[in-house]
UniProtKB/Swiss-Prot annotation:
Homology family: Belongs to the PurK/PurT family.
UniProt-listed Pfam families: ATP-grasp (PF02222), PurT_C (PF21244), RS_preATP-grasp-like (PF22660)
Record key words, sorted: ATP-binding, Ligase, Magnesium, Metal-binding, Nucleotide-binding, Purine biosynthesis
The protein's name: Formate-dependent phosphoribosylglycinamide formyltransferase
Name of the encoding gene: purT
Subunit description: Homodimer.
Domain ATP-grasp: from-to ranges: 118-309
Pathway where it operates: Purine metabolism; IMP biosynthesis via de novo pathway; N(2)-formyl-N(1)-(5-phospho-D-ribosyl)glycinamide from N(1)-(5-phospho-D-ribosyl)glycinamide (formate route): step 1/1
SUPFAM superfamilies membership: Glutathione synthetase ATP-binding domain-like (SSF56059), PreATP-grasp domain (SSF52440), Rudiment single hybrid motif (SSF51246)
Main enzyme class: ligase
Amino acid sequence: MLLGTPLFSNGTKILLLGSGELGKEVIIEAQRLGIECVAVDSYDNAPAMQVAHRSYVIDMKDGDALKAILEKEVPDYIIPEIEAINTDILIEMEEFGHQVVPTANAAKITMDREGIRRLASEQLNIPTAKYEFAESLEELKKAVKKIGAPCIVKPIMSSSGKGQSTVKSEKDEDIEYAWNYAQAGARGIGKKVIVEEFINFDYEITLLTARTAHGTVYCPPIGHIQDGGDYIESWQPHPMSEEMIKKAQEMANKITTVLGGNGIFGVELFIRGDEVIFSEVSPRPHDTGMVTMITQNMSEFEIHLRSILGLPVDIQLITAGASSVIKSKIHKYAPQYDISDAVKVPNTKLRIFGKPLAKVGRRMGVALASANTVEEARKNAKKCANGVIIR
């Protein structure tokens, strides 16, 4: 592997589409290898922009604007970090020889819940929750009746649990609330929602799956808790039998093989008894995987970059650990962070994302903790996160 010098004609260049906290860590890893970094997002001073060589603010669903930047920069690797992107342009650029991570087709299929759910259930026959799609309130009422209450309603495109709610009855007012909530939290164009069967699972995991030039490798399973579809804490390793880990890996391998390309995939799975049930997959680092910054010899971000570049990936768990999200309780531009109490918690680290605008409930940072046991790590991570005061 030959790497050039950033800002010179021989430099190796990556361009991130989406510049949030996950993209920020990818760029930090790239900077360590002397890679030129360009960050793109819909708002200025996004986290990854703060550590990139250059940045652009555009609507990434605007095909002309997106194409103009890609043609201007001519990056070696185009790395989508969010779903709300004009993937038709990515397919076009890939046809002209640009490398899209993992592939333009994978980005298109996984950009919304409909594409990936139909691939998993209807093409690959992978077990999933029962589901229906709806494009109007009337269609949603019929779908809820067919699936049965309780059920989950989500926009087909959203992030961090936005727009997701549980319909607890078949009453019109409950369904109407879910419809309006989904529309308010949706990304992209269109009104379509997915209605999913409510699964009483034993636990849910993220299986970080890396497709590399040397084969597919897996991180130890990551357990996590979500609140309204938004991750609030994760831990690694989650205890599982070897048999169940093998089942999970086989399912992850099946779906990531079809998606193709190299890079890390966040495969979300429900575990119920001896069943593994597919939930979702993202062809990029996963928010629950931030715990790997303290638990593994390579974080998910380093794994992603090394996989993209064709470098060896040797994953080792070095400690039990946990992450706990730091959410804002206020709405403020350019907030400040009092970390005086947080830094007193032993064996913890803070990652403040640097988002320019704090909103109530917005994820502004994460606390990481290592310990001899997952239980101790979870306790310390939460204590550290709760010790951060946003002002």
